[in-house]
Every structure is written in structure tokens, then in C-alpha cells.
Amino acid sequence: MKNRVTGLGGFFFKTRNPDQIKEWYKNHLGIPTDQYGWTFWWKDENGNKCSTQWSPFKEDTTYFSPSEKQFMMNFRVENLKELLKVLKEEGVTIIGEIEEYDYGKFGWILDPEGNKIELWEPVGSVFLEDKDL
């Protein structure tokens, strides 16, 4: 498989108080936030519109399970179904089933240290249609 990961889709982390931490990042680092955190919009080397999501989660979230780590990374991929098939053949632990939404497909794996990694195959036309970059 030629292209596996095409970019960083997001960085998610646990915190005691997501609203308070978003306010801190807004006040001290100038990151405007919304209910999910913040989406950084950018263009790749070919001029395609892209995004990276930064999101604090409540410390008791189960979204990172079965990992017990304080963070989870999301990587953008081109062909999630094929990639998960290849990763499974390589012995990588796959978590759950592929989930599909109007903005993309998602799958999850564990790295050797138990970090849950989210893989995202975005659907750009739906997710980016109102963004003027």
C-alpha cells in the first residue's frame, strides 16, 4: 500500500475541565475555541483544503478506550478499508468496526504501547464546502 497516512487529522486529550482549559488556550495562546475545541484549516502541498482538529475531552471519557492514555491522535488516510485490512495482516490490533458519517469514515487501532490511534478518511466535499482557504 503506497500512501497510508496523509497528515495529522487531530489531537485529542483528556482534562479535568475542558471548558476551563479551552479558555486558558484562548486567553494565553490566542486559540479561538468552539464546543469541540478548534479546527485549524490549511492547504496541503497540492492545494487541497485540509483541517486538523484540536479537542480537549473530559478526563472520564471512554472515547479513548481501551487505551488508558491521556491523549489520542487522529491521522488522515486515503483508503481506510484497505489500510485496516493491511494493518490487520501485519498484526496490528484493530479496535471496533469502521464507522461512516457524512464527513468521513473512521477506524481505530492500538500502537505497541497501547495508544489508541484514530484513522480518518475524510469526505472533503461535505466537510470543507463552506471553507474559503
PLM segments and residue spans:
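Conserved beta-strand in the GNAT
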Residues: 52-55, 108, 118
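Vicinal oxygen chelate
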Residues: 16-20, 67-68, 72-116
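Acetyl-CoA-dependent GNAT
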Residues: 58-60, 96, 121-123
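Active-site beta-strand termini and strand-to-loop segments that position acidic
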Residues: 42-47, 109-112, 122
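Short, flexible, solvent-exposed loop/turn segments with mixed acidic/basic and small polar residues
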Residues: 1-2, 60-65
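A short acidic/small-residue loop/turn micro-motif
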Residues: 36, 102, 123-126
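Core segments of cupin and vicinal oxygen chelate
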Residues: 2-6, 12-55, 89
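N-terminal beta-strand motif that seeds the catalytic metal site of vicinal oxygen chelate
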Residues: 1-22, 70-75, 123-133
